[in-house]
């Protein structure tokens, strides 16, 4: 089993109920999963990581999704106890439509590394998308 989100950037802003099908979940997948599945006891933190990282990599047949010597450093650093309300105006990605607007959640993504390079940083509440184009796998 996997937990996935839709990483499809779009600049077309319109009300949620008028937007194309599908939800852009780049900024909401981790906090909503922590809030609704981990904090409620449905999943352990390890099971969440397996379903969002290890299992998708295994299904896709790519050598990713684990932290181990010699492996590629694709890492998301999360503060699982930080609380905030989802505000799509603060999203670093182009997609802004979300059914979670205003939802109170736990779990703030602080950094994202792809191929060992920081591509996203939220340092002291200042979100910075360092690279729009993610390095190739």
Q: What are these model-predicted stretches?
A:
Residues 1-3:
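Conserved small/polar residues in nucleotide/adenosyl-binding loops
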Residues 15-18, 72-134:
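C-terminal cap of metal-dependent C-N hydrolases
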Residues 6-81:
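His/Asp/Glu-enriched, well-ordered alpha-helical/loop segment
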